[in-house]
């Protein structure tokens, strides 16, 4: 062996130390299980594991001693570390040389005892002790008949009749005697070979071994009650669910009930339960396409929302909390184009080269919805909110949000909530009653949910509470909902239990309207599923036109993976949910309406891009408090910060925009889209 090879051998031996330490830590954890240590069969298996690890450490020590290297100190340190591991292992299992021991209570002498090894209840080889016993429905249970004597051909059992009482196999007595020392090694090798052959049966011995039965999940239900017969058994109650942590070849399994009690139960009293996974992937959020590039801006700039996303197990009782916990429910996702499965074209964005505009896409539902008013609402102390979204109510107990969440702030007058019906210079756009609804779902179970909520003070701060919700059906008799005024009734758990008459319920007046003819081309250029403020319609159309121009018309190489740097495509979807920034854009845009009326669509798109750069893009880069529609103080501070720059822009005082402190260069990646990342496939 060369010197270079010896150094490699020593280094390889040192690299195995973490593996040995992990195995010893696992054995120390097993030793703390006092219940397992009280059973002789468990203890025997534990001792066998320690002995096997002892043998591996001895072999490893010989390998280190034989290694030739000039780094003597490294070899000494390795041997010293190995000795420490052996000391820990010896402390765990003093029975180093003892391979088995007797648990028989018979008074016969050792010479008269039969030399046999018949195990009545043997520890399952399908579950390792280091696996978590508390995992629910995420493991496999493999039941295999293990026979230490000559295996017999498995006899097919007749199917059990429903009227017959299920009976377990009779218990076999535990009689494990100590074999002769000379046969110990051979018996252990034979046992390991038998277990290995049973766990991994080959084609040649398939006739001798019963095929394993594999099921997904370890949750079973008791089909009948069963009383414990001996110490260590667990009582079964009909209809109760139990978690199986260990299996046996004789049919006696280790079960865990809902109170944490553990014991042996007969498998014939159990029936497997196929439970649904805890976290069902969202139909919307699992396929976001290019929108995930835009999400990166929000997840890095808003720590509170990023922290909320980690609380996946939290159940949201209103749309507001769902919106705060999931960025996928905002316009930052639904506005950006979505790549198709080919990773070349787009799912909902097409360009007409003949007309030089975005190709129109007709969907099943394309309406203007107006919230007229809410009646007979309870008196509230703080701010009121109205949230809307498309939801799938196929499963009433677990509705699925399939669009973004749109928010309105009503004007509360006693028990009636009003909304702004016309565009106003003094009112905010978040109070405007009309919103555009586009949906390409054909299923009648996809409906529009309208939820009323209010803010209440709690010990941890301001919290949003629901006052009830109602559903507006969008597909009626396989046709789109007709244009009319609908009277809906808010409902919640308390009102449902009270069974109030309709005359005393909280009413919602919702008016459904067709899209005006001069706005149809704008609406048809938008994504297939979206809900947004009707005042934003020109902005959204120009955004989609610029996206089609850059991503399709002017893109010479659709296979290119280069980042597309464009401030409008990357930043505008993020500011769409911030109504205070959108208010500024709307006011400036309104002053240009007369001039814009004389320009074509391409020129209007260019003008919108300049307006965006001078307002939303610039304001978005200002260091100020994060947007929160629920906090009026936050909105007031943001308004004061932005108004100072807007006034300077209107007066032409551009000197105020010059930075008076040290600044960092702009990171172009923050204003770019990664179209061909692994997250972009639809």
UniProtKB/Swiss-Prot annotation:
PROSITE patterns: SH3. Residues 128-148 have a biased composition (Acidic residues). Expressed in ciliated sensory neurons of the head (amphid neurons) and the tail in hermaphrodites (phasmid neurons) and males (sensory ray neurons). The gene is nphp-1. It comes from the Eukaryota. Plays a role in the extension of dendrites from phasmid ciliated sensory neurons. May be necessary for initial assembly of the cilium. The keyword Phosphoprotein does not apply. Residues 96-188 are annotated as: Disordered. Residues 10-100 form a coiled coil. Disruption phenotype: Impaired male mating behavior. Transmembrane segments: none annotated. One of its GO terms (cellular component) is ciliary basal body. Residues 215-275 form the SH3 domain. Keywords: Behavior, Cilium biogenesis/degradation, Coiled coil, SH3 domain. GO terms for biological process: determination of adult lifespan; neuronal signal transduction; non-motile cilium assembly; protein localization; protein localization involved in establishment of planar polarity; response to hermaphrodite contact; turning behavior involved in mating. Belongs to the nephrocystin-1 family. This is Nephrocystin-1-like protein.
């Amino acid at each position: 062996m060369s010197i270079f090879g010896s150094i490699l051998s020593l280094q390889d031996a040192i690299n195995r130390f973490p593996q040995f330490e992990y195995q010893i830590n696992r054995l120390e954890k097993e030793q703390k299980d006092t219940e397992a240590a009280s059973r002789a069969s468990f203890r025997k298996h534990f001792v066998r594991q320690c002995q096997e690890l002892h043998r591996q450490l001895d072999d490893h020590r010989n390998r280190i001693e034989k290694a030739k290297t000039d780094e003597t100190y490294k070899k000494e340190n390795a041997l010293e570390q190995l000795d420490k591991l052996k000391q820990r292992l010896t402390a765990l299992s003093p029975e180093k040389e003892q391979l088995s021991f007797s648990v028989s209570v018979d008074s016969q002498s050792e010479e008269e005892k039969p030399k046999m090894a018949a195990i009545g209840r043997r520890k399952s080889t399908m579950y390792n002790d280091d696996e978590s016993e508390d995992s629910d429905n995420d493991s496999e249970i493999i039941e295999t008949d293990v026979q230490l004597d000559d295996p017999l051909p498995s006899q097919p059992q007749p199917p059990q009749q429903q009227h017959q009482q299920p009976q377990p196999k009779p218990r076999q007595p535990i009689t494990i005697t100590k074999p002769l020392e000379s046969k110990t090694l051979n018996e252990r090798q034979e046992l390991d070979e038998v277990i290995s052959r049973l766990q991994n049966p080959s084609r040649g011995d398939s006739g001798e071994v019963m095929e394993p039965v594999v099921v997904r999940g370890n949750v079973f239900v008791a089909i009948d009650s069963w009383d414990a017969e001996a110490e260590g058994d667990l009582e079964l109650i009909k209809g109760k669910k139990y978690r199986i942590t260990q299996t046996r070849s004789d049919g006696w399994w280790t079960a865990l009930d809902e109170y944490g009690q553990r014991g042996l139960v007969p498998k014939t009293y159990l029936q497997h339960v196929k439970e649904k996974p805890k976290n069902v992937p969202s139909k919307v959020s699992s396929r976001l396409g290019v929108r995930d590039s835009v999400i990166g801006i929000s997840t890095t700039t808003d720590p509170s929302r990023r922290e909320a996303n980690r609380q996946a197990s939290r159940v949201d009782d209103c749309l507001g909390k769902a919106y705060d916990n999931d960025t996928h429910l905002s316009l930052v996702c639904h506005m950006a184009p979505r790549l198709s499965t080919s990773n070349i074209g787009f799912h909902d964005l097409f360009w007409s080269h003949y007309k030089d505009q975005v190709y129109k896409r007709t969907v099943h539902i394309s309406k203007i919805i107006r919230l007229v008013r809410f009646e007979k609402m309870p008196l509230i102390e703080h701010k009121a909110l109205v949230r809307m979204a498309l939801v799938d109510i196929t499963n009433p107990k677990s509705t699925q949000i399939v669009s973004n969440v749109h928010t309105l702030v009503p004007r509360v007058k006693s028990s009636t909530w009003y909304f702004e019906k016309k565009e106003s210079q003094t009112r905010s756009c978040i109070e405007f009653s009309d919103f555009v609804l586009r949906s390409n779902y054909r299923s009648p179970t996809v409906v529009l949910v309208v939820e009323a909520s209010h803010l209440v003070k709690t010990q941890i701060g301001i919290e949003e509470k629901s006052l009830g919700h109602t559903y507006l059906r969008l597909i009626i008799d396989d046709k789109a909902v007709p244009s009319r005024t609908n009277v809906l009734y808010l409902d919640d758990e308390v009102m449902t239990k009270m069974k109030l008459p309709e005359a005393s319920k909280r009413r919602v007046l919702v008016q459904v309207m067709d899209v005006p003819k001069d706005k149809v081309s704008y609406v048809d250029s938008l994504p297939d599923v979206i809900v947004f403020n009707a005042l934003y319609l020109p902005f959204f159309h120009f955004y989609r036109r610029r996206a089609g121009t850059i991503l399709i018309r002017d893109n010479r190489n659709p296979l290119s993976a280069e980042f597309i740097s464009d401030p409008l495509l990357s930043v505008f979807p993020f500011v769409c949910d911030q109504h205070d920034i959108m208010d500024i854009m709307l006011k400036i845009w309104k002053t240009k309406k007369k001039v814009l009326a004389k320009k074509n669509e391409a020129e209007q798109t260019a003008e919108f891009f300049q307006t965006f750069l001078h307002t939303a893009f610039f304001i978005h880069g200002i260091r100020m408090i994060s947007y929160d529609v629920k906090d009026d103080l936050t909105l007031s501070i943001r308004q004061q910060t932005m108004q100072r720059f807007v006034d300077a822009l209107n007066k032409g005082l551009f000197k105020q925009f010059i930075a008076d402190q040290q600044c960092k260069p702009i990171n172009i990646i923050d204003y770019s889209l990664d179209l061909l990342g692994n997250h972009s496939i639809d």
